[in-house]
Amino acid sequence: MADGNTRFTVDEALVAMGFGKFQIYVLAYAGMGWVAEAMEMMLLSFVGPAVQSLWNLSARQESLITSVVFAGMLIGAYSWGIVSDKHGRRKGFIITAVVTFVAGFLSAFSPNYMWLIILRCLVGLGLGGGPVLASWYLEFIPAPSRGTWMVVFSAFWTVGTIFEASLAWLVMPRLGWRWLLAFSSVPSSLLLLFYRWTSESPRYLILQGRKAEALAILEKIARMNKTQLPPGVLSSELETELEENKNIPTENTHLLKAGESGEAVAVSKIVLKADKEPGFSLLALLSPTLMKRTLLLWVVFFGNAFAYYGVVLLTTELNNSHNRCYPTEKQLRNSNDVNYRDVFIASFAEFPGLLISAAMVDRLGRKASMASMLFTCCIFLLPLLSHQSPFITTVLLFGGRICISAAFTVVYIYAPEIYPTAVRTTGVGVGSSVGRIGGILCPLVAVGLVHGCHQTIAVLLFEVVILVSGICVCLFPFETSGRDLTDSISASKEPPSASV
């Protein structure tokens, strides 16, 4: 047995064991959840127009079908984040899988518009648990390869969007939208089927003082990866910090830099309370230690969601509006198959987006990757301020989707990294909730304004939101590439030399 004074943290254990068979299983499970969410989101591009013609809905009623999903996600992302920080990651994502599958399957039997709205809102409530799965997966990944493997995880979203576009192309013309809804709920059921083989996050367990359980899971990882744990005793990051600082009462008491004593005691109580009781984690997100990164992240999540789903909806809406808003032009759209083709082609834009983010995320860092992609997306959308041909429109939206999907991929890597384990899923969940507000407003612009032949105003709004998001990325306090994840809020202060 190693010297009892030798200690190792979860991060050190994960680095020592490397990325192996255990992480592949975790990736497959979390990836299936990401496929499920992507499919449920992408089908909105097809179901809305289908029920609009079936039930004679107005443009506002059609856009509401998408907006209520985001409204449900707004509530769900916050709620499931709190649940998973308080009761564990596994309990958080199993509840969301049940809600998503049941509501998604039942929505195929909606007898009228109101029932469809209610059930799709419940689907959104379940889909709000997506950040819990992402955080759970992240907490098993060794720091040196975290960026690359998070991009691989994001590839499952791309697989889901392409699979949904293919499924819609095959199912909609023959069987209709109800069958599409039923088939799209299948991936969520697989999460229920394989749930019993999942493991709780060792980071969460050790933060709760359940060291024996955390150690058992780390030993399981070592066995499956055919490696060994570091010598010594498993220790939490907070214990290590307190041990190192036990002879420095000023910093240990205040948990803040010198000169902030006026509010130090109050803040330290919030921080320590959040470390022990996740119910206080929302308050901790707005403490001086985390406030700047939290507010900036909210803006970036809003902008990414608003732009991403906007580009998805514009792929069908802009080309459909050409004949309506420019009646003197040659009628180019003769069948609904063209819409399926456009969405199918546009979905493939996410593959180069993934490749770009994979190439940039560890080399250039998270911040530079996000900012460059957001600003480039602005350039692609700029010509759409005026009317373009359907071909040029599709090409520009293809380029815009490459960029915004790359930016969205990186923000889902960066967001969990800037928060400690004590508030990670709450922080990402609340940020994702703010992003859902962007999703709620997005159809009002991409569908409502475009239907009203206000393409210039719609595209201008997207340009402004994306530009502001890019600026906020530049203002993030530090880079996370290659850094260890922190567990306690008190250990998550900005590094002395934050990279820009």
Swiss-Prot record:
Q: Which residues lie on this side of the membrane: Extracellular?
A: 45-62, 119-120, 172-174, 315-341, 388-401, 451-456
Residue spans crossing the bilayer: 24-44, 63-83, 98-118, 121-141, 151-171, 175-195, 294-314, 342-362, 368-387, 402-422, 430-450, 457-477
Please list the GO terms describing molecular function. Answer: ATP binding; N-methylnicotinate transmembrane transporter activity; nicotinate transmembrane transporter activity
GO BP, sorted A to Z: monoatomic ion transport; N-methylnicotinate transport; nicotinate transport
The record's section on SUPFAM superfamilies has: MFS general substrate transporter
* Keyword Cell division set for record: no
Q: Which residues lie on this side of the membrane: Cytoplasmic?
A: 1-23, 84-97, 142-150, 196-293, 363-367, 423-429, 478-500
Where do the record's glycosylation annotations fall on this chain?
A: N56, N319
Q: Does the keyword Magnesium apply?
A: no
Q: Which domain of life is it from?
A: Eukaryota
Q: Where in the cell is it found?
A: Membrane
* PANTHER family, per the entry: MAJOR FACILITATOR-TYPE TRANSPORTER HXNZ-RELATED, SYNAPTIC VESICLE GLYCOPROTEIN 2
- What is the recorded name of this protein? Organic cation/carnitine transporter 7
Q: What species is given as this protein's source?
A: Arabidopsis thaliana (Mouse-ear cress)
